[in-house]
Amino acid sequence: MTVTDVTQSTFSYKPLLVATGLNMIWINLSEVFRYFAFVMPMMRDAFPVLPEVAPMNIPVFLVWGIWDTILVLSVCMIAWLSLDKFGTSIKSTVLIGTGIWASIFVILWLGLFNMNLATPQILLTALPLAWIELVVAVFIVRWSMLRN
């Protein structure tokens, strides 16, 4: 039996960490803007009889922080692996962003709509803004990959 050297992987974590850091800022800003400018007022208008609809308190912010962290990590990892596999063309980038958006936000909002917890107007506002958010996020990952 002979012992052979195992070659070290040439994968660099720095571009992925840069993309994750930038997306932590971008996605959090986008989520906060979309929520405060559109979703929260629309939810309160649509469901005035529900107490505590779209509340603003510490437990909500803590859950939102967990949501944003999972969202950023998922988007960055899925985008990185997909761009590595399918290429970094603009077409691939937009398609990957659209796929991640459909997997997260379309399912979320359709579920809320199906349970009568969202109106068509909320969907028609939140979904396009979320699509822009995720396509930009995937472009950030692409930029970081190509920069390496």
Predicted segments with their positions:
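Juxtamembrane/disordered regions of integral membrane proteins
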Residues: 1-148
